[in-house]
Amino acid sequence: MDLSVFSGFSLIYGEPGVGKTSLALRIAEGLGRKILYISMYEYKSKIEDKIKYLQLDIDRFSIYDFINISEREAVLEAIGDIYVREAPDVVVIDGVNYFPDNRETASAIYRMFDIPVIAIGEEPAGRSPLAYMADLLIEMRQEFSRGARYRYARFLKSRLGQPPAAELRLAVVRGGPVLIEPWNEGKLGPAAIPLSMRRVVFAAEAVEALAAARQDYARPGLLEGSRVADFVGQGPEDMALASAVLCDYAESARTALIYTHRTIERFVKCDVKRRLVPVDALADDKGLEALMDAVGDAKVAFLHGLEQVVFRLGVRRLRLVLDFLSSWRPDLAVAAFFSGVEPSPRLFDMFNTVWRIEAGKAEVVKSMLGWPVRRFKVERREGAFHFIPSSI
């Protein structure tokens, strides 16, 4: 995200626990090397704990708290003195509700600084004189649906630039909050990650047709930033095919296997980084952290068992999980497997390419990447799955 919209006086407000402080800390670190943090309601030690959890550089922060001090004019004067003495690049004021809600005080705070400022408040800060003066106004909120938490940052006003969207989803994770932008299926990286074609073999005519249609493909595979969905059956052959695809990608690039249930484990016959992330964990930001840990520096994320996410948490949650990965790692290619369900149009816009594979047949249901051959027979010979173009 372009942080130039935060180059003036920004006010972030919302209910407690929605992630205001975490977002302010992350943005502040991106705006300057030296950060002055003024806290009106939390002790310095608690702010330090948050900085450590977010894995930010604590040496860049000078933290002052003014807990239980009732002389507000004296506090304002002290903040001004600290600002002059510290000479920071950016200031964070956490707890602007502490100050009198009048134009005179708001003007004093607004005019005190000539560098980027991020002020944090709770309601009714969004209707205060300071909100009127602010260059950037963000309302943060959260809601729960089917047991899953959703955080939002809504840009209500921006004088110094165009925000990326009117509203962004947000996840508070180690390493700093991730602003989750909608995935753009046309925004792909230049590098292709091919199947090794040792376990999954496409017939020569299919490979040649694909190479002619897409010069960036020497053979079937994934582009950086792309997403492919495979809808397969639930039988042993289906699990073996999914494992074959996984292992072929693992031979071409670092690949991480993340699964919501252990069904596929016994079918994986190659050395690949793997991790179980239960569906219930994906209802909150801790589960998204687990995804980050599981993916690490892999080039391909192989997600198995996503039908369970749809059944238990809903399509909305699946979209957030996928968009989180794309926002955190725009270069990450995703191969997503759904077992025992039919491809649904509700899911199509989450993927560049959608396959249906079952009972010896494979069909490209959707392709934004130019698959010229859409139907295949699938035959298993000598330990490999062969995809042979078919008119049936």
Predicted regions and their residues:
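Long, charge-rich C-terminal accessory regions
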Residues: 223-225, 231, 235-248, 252-254, ...
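Short, hydrophobic beta-strand segments that form beta-sheet elements in well-ordered domains
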Residues: 36-39, 117-122, 255-261, 278-279, ...
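Residue-level preference for the first positions of well-ordered beta-strands
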Residues: 9-11, 34-36, 89-92, 116-118, ...
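Conserved inter-motif catalytic segment of the P-loop NTP-binding fold
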Residues: 33-101, 256-315
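Glycine-rich P-loop/Walker A and Walker A-like loops and their local beta1-loop-alpha1 context
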Residues: 4-33, 202-262
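Phosphate-binding/switch region of NTP-binding enzymes
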Residues: 121-174, 337-392
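Charged, amphipathic alpha-helical linker segments immediately N-terminal to NTP-binding catalytic cores
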Residues: 159-205
